Each structure stands twice: as C-alpha cells, then as structure tokens.
Amino acid sequence: MASYFNQNTLIYLNGHFVKAVDAKMDFYSQSLHYGYSVFEGIRSYKTVDGSTKIFKPVEHYNRLEQSATTINMPYHWKTEELIQITDELLAKNQLGDAYIRPVVYAPANMTFSVNNESFLVIQAWEMAPFLGEKLLRVRTSSFQRPNPGAFHLQAKAAGHYVNSILASQEAKAKGFDEALLLDMQGNVAEAPGANIFIEKNGKLFTPPAGHILPGITR
C-alpha cells in the first residue's frame, strides 16, 4: 500500500497543526459509515524561481464550500483563511510538487439526520503527475455515471466515489490504464477522476454538465 506520511508529517486538523501519526477521528462519524463528507483535490507546483504555487486555490476552496452546502453540511471556513493554512502546511512539510486534500467531515451520528457541526482536515503529500505522460489505454466501463436525479453530482462528495473506484478497478483488472464512463443515455461522460476533452479540427469538446462533476480546469 502507498504511504502518504511519515513520523514527521504534519496535517491541519480542526484548528491545529498536528503530526499525522497522532491524528484521531471519531469512528462513529457519519462520514465513515455513510460516505457523508466532501473534499477537494488540489495541486501545488514548484516554480522555476523555487517558490511553491497552489493551482487555483480560490476556485477549489469555493467549490469545497459549495459542495458542503449542497449536501447540507455546516460550513464556517473562509476561503482566504484556508489558502493561508494550506500555504503554511506545504511550508511546514517542505513540499513543492504536492497533492493537497482538504476534507470536511461529520461528527458522530449513526442516523441520517442533519448535523450542527462539521470538522476539517487538510493533508498534503508529494505527488508526481497524476497519470504520467504516456498514452493511456482506456476501456468503456460497465458502470454508468449515477442518475443526476438521485444525487447532487455537482458536489464533490466522498460516497459518490464508490462509482469511480469500481469503474477504475474493473478497467485495471482487464489490463487497461483507466476507465471511461458513459451516462444513462450511453453518451461519453467522464473518467473516474477526471473530465474528458476531445480535440477535433482545432476545437476542444467536452461533455456538458449534468452527469459529470465539472472540474476546476474544465
């Protein structure tokens, strides 16, 4: 299994920087049992002048808030505050080319009722290009994108990614690099963790919103 931290790695957990090895969460959390949490996947890059820059942090953290409010999770953090915390987290861990994962998660709740609070963790780890630079062999998945009438697909919610995990696992088990998911009408929708773009005659085409999670770079 991949290792994302060591004995010295720091994460930001509910207002404090703590060592990842010392971090704890409630095992009765509604997030753990029902996938009721929202998150972002943000990249940072080491620039030619040696500084570290986060890619579109405002857009990512604004979407984190939108995802939380869309699925009725309490949210009280400010985007500017979270960007500052993330910059500090990268510096403390001496990270440049990194993947940043903020997660808003629920307290203990073994029912389906609304919570009166949410918690926040921000983690970061060194990361190479997501799928590398080689051409990929992709396979149309037997799993469809979910019905947009059954879920708020514009929310980047954890539970929704079981669909992505199954599609990706299926493709790799059959010898492919990644999956391509179709919508309910059989149209191309997206990959398990990325939007799809096609270049034709000098123009870019991408599936419309509806059955997809509209990406920040889309």
Regions found by a protein language model. Name each.
Residues A91-A98:
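Short secondary-structure junctions
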